[in-house]
Swiss-Prot record:
It comes from Desulforapulum autotrophicum (strain ATCC 43914 / DSM 3382 / VKM B-1955 / HRM2). Binds 2 Zn(2+) ions per subunit. This is Dihydroorotase. The active site is at D307. Belongs to the metallo-dependent hydrolases superfamily. DHOase family. Class I DHOase subfamily. Substrate binds at H64, L65, R66, N96, N280, H311, F325, G326. Zn(2+) 1 binds at H62, H64, D154, D307. One of its GO terms (molecular function) is dihydroorotase activity. Its EC number is 3.5.2.3. Keywords: Hydrolase, Metal-binding, Pyrimidine biosynthesis, Zinc. GO terms for cellular component: cytoplasm. Catalyzes the reversible cyclization of carbamoyl aspartate to dihydroorotate. The lineage of its organism: Bacteria, Pseudomonadati, Thermodesulfobacteriota, Desulfobacteria, Desulfobacterales. Its cofactor is Zn(2+). It comes from the Bacteria. The gene is pyrC.
Amino acid sequence: MLIRFKGAHIVDPGNINEQKDLLVKDGLVHALLDPGAADPEPGIDTVDVTGMLLVPGLIDLHVHLREPGHEYKETIQTGLMAAAKGGFTAVCPMPNTSPVNDNAQVTRFILDRAKAAGLSRVYPVGAITLGLKGETLAEYGEMKQAGMVAITDDGRPVENARVMRRAMEYATGLGLPVMSHSEDLSLARDGAMNEGSFATRIGIKGIPNAAESIMVMREIAIAELTHARVHIAHVSCEESVDAIRHGKQRGVQVTCETAPHYFTLTDKAVGDYDTHAKMNPPLRSEADRLAVIKGLQDGTIDCIATDHAPHSPLEKAVEFDQAAFGIIGLETSLVLSLKLVQDELLSMETLVEKMSRNPARFLGLDNRLIPGNPADITVIDPDRVHVIDPETFVSKSRNTPFAGIEVKGEVLLTMVEGRIIYQREI
């Protein structure tokens, strides 16, 4: 099958940033053609994407698909539907399922479900420790053979530094990166939002920046000691950005991600105890928000992920202290991130680096739009203005703090290996 994407501005960092036509054949990028060039062979289906942006498929390094065990929140099928609608051609599900993804059997189950869904690619992340208990290391070798790509105890920190050292040593021997949920529970325990004047005024126990940054510094130090690759998840505060910047300057193999809510909102979004603005780490101060943007600008922050964390209404419609941490993000991440481009804080090329190229590098993938590579593509309508409406989500859950916000830009089409897995109704 031959498909010609006609009229788009292609943004592929380090490769192309201009108007070209893209030809897809048998699931692969076949050729880049000048606008107006004749079809190189007969039987080509043309998709007119004039005025649109065409980029390598977006990749989300941090999602919670909830299956197995919590299918009332999300399933692999519905999570991948949300990913496709959000422009993501690949996602990395975290291991905090039930049972935990701490063995090859669960890894294979996730991959089998993903294959049956036939949507975005799935690269499972396995647990650092059995049962996420922070004690006994999981069997990384067997999980890697089954298809696991990295390890983390996300949702919980590995509190014991010796266990984390052993994990990094073991992972390094297998060529696996270690993703860190950086949280000092002795500082964060019982907290529900950012520690600051606003939390004091509304009477909510706070979580200080130090609860995150202390553990970020520890992980960087252990990675330096063990020569491991460490990836800091969901960076939210200025001190963490500074620590990662200094670690990179020392040559430590540290990468990191943030999420759109950390450069879009502050702790003021909690407002009148809005549990949809409760996540971990929490929304921080304006100074932290600006520090995260600076980290994206100067390359300290490598990736934008979602930390897509679905919850049922019953888990959010309770007192703020008792509500579950987490928000969904697969269907809103791109449109919120495009605001950075619209406000001239990032170039479109840099945004694609954060949401596609750098996540691909983390996974050891080459997702450039060059002949012979898989045709994993996201087409974006940069001008469509709309209001975020959770009732239109295809995710099972609706827990977002962005309901009612007007945004500019929307995914028009998502393609994986030459198959259109999502196309916006016009």
